[in-house]
Amino acid sequence: MVVSEVDIAKADPAAASHPLLLNGDATVAQKNPGSVAENNLCSQYEEKVRPCIDLIDSLRALGVEQDLALPAIAVIGDQSSGKSSVLEALSGVALPRGSGIVTRCPLVLKLKKLVNEDKWRGKVSYQDYEIEISDASEVEKEINKAQNAIAGEGMGISHELITLEISSRDVPDLTLIDLPGITRVAVGNQPADIGYKIKTLIKKYIQRQETISLVVVPSNVDIATTEALSMAQEVDPEGDRTIGILTKPDLVDKGTEDKVVDVVRNLVFHLKKGYMIVKCRGQQEIQDQLSLSEALQREKIFFENHPYFRDLLEEGKATVPCLAEKLTSELITHICKSLPLLENQIKETHQRITEELQKYGVDIPEDENEKMFFLIDKVNAFNQDITALMQGEETVGEEDIRLFTRLRHEFHKWSTIIENNFQEGHKILSRKIQKFENQYRGRELPGFVNYRTFETIVKQQIKALEEPAVDMLHTVTDMVRLAFTDVSIKNFEEFFNLHRTAKSKIEDIRAEQEREGEKLIRLHFQMEQIVYCQDQVYRGALQKVREKELEEEKKKKSWDFGAFQSSSATDSSMEEIFQHLMAYHQEASKRISSHIPLIIQFFMLQTYGQQLQKAMLQLLQDKDTYSWLLKERSDTSDKRKFLKERLARLTQARRRLAQFPG
């Protein structure tokens, strides 16, 4: 269940219009009428707000953001826009300051409001390092140390996160991501491409639909010229997820105050989430060591007494406490909207990573006996896939075709070749029969069939099929070889020595079986030079041919033997030979069209597959080669480890989402 926006609105103490309640001033609550009701509101607020933020923070701590975008507020601004001052005012601690690039790594600022404690606690964590801080004055030093460790001690930047957690009664419940200030040109010892690098880092965050961009802009500049707002508009042209923060209102030129008011009231550059205006410590106040709490008091007095800006204070659009309330409310609403989609994304990604991890198998055992069993499993899986190919039962994708189906297609083409061969022969019989009759006729009287003429024609037509049969053998062999190689890739791809060994055996056995298959095919065609058919079979075929011709004669669609019409005796002899040829062709084509595919299947699928399976099993005989055969590609174990880490993160994320009390 996800916390609804209505629930958040009901529980939001901002509705009570007591900014100090956010900062934990219990005495003010006691003095105000209706303080009990307000305290109840605070309690409800804590029950709903903190779990939402903690959930997202815990997912970010797990590293889920490496896999999916999480709801966040990213703070961006040009250099010297007052971005650091705003974050200091919200967090109550001093952050790194100075000239040039101060924020050199994304800083995740986790603020946690303590209700019944006065003790301040802090923690800085990055990479595998973590340090607890008990004094707020130590924060700046630790952040600088973290940035130097990650990005070096120069002026470079890094995409690696630093996390600063602050728990205090004086901070709001809020998590922000502070990004480096935008710079246009490199100065001093900054890298020449520093501006491009910073913009790339910022875009990485703000282009995500899950990110609210908090754009910090000085009040004394033309808002349309600021790089930060321009970048936000580029990725969020409708301004749906952008909040504008105006700073330095005390530096606004006289006579331009009304323009600033128009900006804050969303009349100049429209943003759906609107604008806020704040006054933080100036440089002189920092040098004078003005405390942050005192700065908040001065800010309130400034807006209360300002002739133009006091209305903005009354409208809840001014001061840091109002900003804190707005940001917390926006973040919680944003999280609530994002949670259902986030849960689905985590589920889908978890499933995809699980499937991908299965392709990489399990880690290779260290123990020699375990290696043997591991290799046995691998070889057995390979052999089972080969058996499935041999039996035409392999699993294929929606767009793929089984090997046996493709072989059937080749065998069907072979039948067509045979049919076309005989049909083409029938077309030219009228010329050849007369030639053979004149060449081979012996003592027989006209009208008698010359057997040698018949035999010679049969032999020539069948002999013409020998090379197409051998061509089909080579075609099928390549198809089977590729299919077997694909099985090797599927099972052994990550083990390059095992895959290479399997490929070598696939090739060696292919060559041997192809030679044997071709030898038997050519032997078959040698046997086909013996003109033979069982008597009863041949008589039946001849009878059918004659019956068909009689039927065609009745329909006056008899064959045209134009060249032989001058002699009725010759016509009779030629018709007789033609009938015998037709009868023999029918029976021979049945024999050849089935027998040649049988030979090919036997040698190039069944025996080929069986010999390959035996050869792979023989690998198990030499224990000394186990380690060599199971040597993985250099990136395989790294990829498996990476996927396991992702899967572990996503598994924990799913568990935490399932346990979320909302």
Curated annotation (Swiss-Prot):
**Major subcellular location class:** cytoplasm
Region: Stalk; residue ranges are 367-632
Q: Where is this region: Middle domain?
A: 366-533
Q: Name what induces it.
A: By type I and type III interferons. Isoform 2 is induced by HSV-1.
Q: Where is this region: G5 motif?
A: 279-282
* Positions bearing N-acetylmethionine: M1
What is the designated name of this protein? Interferon-induced GTP-binding protein Mx1
Q: Which organism is it from?
A: Homo sapiens (Human)
Upper taxonomic lineage: Eukaryota, Metazoa, Chordata, Craniata, Vertebrata
Q: Which gene encodes it?
A: MX1
